[in-house]
């Protein structure tokens, strides 16, 4: 009987000492404490014919974009970050919603593809101007209409669309 009690105590101690103990991997971070910025200075992305979006650079130096394609049926929504992402060996993360909303995914790819778009004035492929990425200050959030929210600190980024998104942090990045 004493062995069973000692074993149960050791097992409980191991679970409680785990950094993820009690954490719900699907738990959506609370973004209410962040200060909302005016979306207009960040609204620098347009991919012909119908995708609008906001772009920003994080205090950590990687780039992010949150977009809405309204003429699609149903509308498409997406949030992505790319570059040297903290807490993961992947260089891209994205959450996408259209017919359904799936959990975000990490991936590795050619980052130059993230900088390409189709211009509406002369429909051809162009490259995003680096000046179009405005710094999203630590402690702030960008709420993109009909899409979702991205928030940053000095060391982390969270983007949420509905019940799914991603959290980037040197302490460990995750998708939900």
What does each model-found stretch correspond to?
Residues 57-59, 74-75, 143-144, 152:
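Residue-level signal for mature regions of secreted extracellular proteins and peptides
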